[in-house]
Amino acid sequence: TDLLSDNEIIENLIFISNGSPGKLIDNLEIWDQIPENIKHDIKYPLKNYENILFLAKHITSQLNLDQQEFLLDYMQRIWWKKTKNKMFAEILEGIKKNISSNLQPRISWEVGLLKVKLKDS
């Protein structure tokens, strides 16, 4: 399997918790609430354009905004470790900014993830 090991997941969750035990507990709870299909599909590289549209739909229909913001932080961490591509981090940060500004979350996810795929092609 190409899923991250439990140790890698914990390491990433600790990193995005910025050393705060309380934040780590919150992040562990959020991680456990995220459906497995979403956890699987956020791995870099993204599969294809159709998968990206389904991923955006699943994220926005199955996760609340706090969970989506957490997921973006997590994706920034795992994608940075894999690619060291600053542009991808900026795109993900842009999605987070858009959804926290109450712009259409699904469109924000679709456009952002499609940008990543286009830059990666």
Q: Which residues make up each language-model segment?
A:
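Charged, glycine-rich active-site and insertion segments that engage polyanionic ligands
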Residues: T1-S121
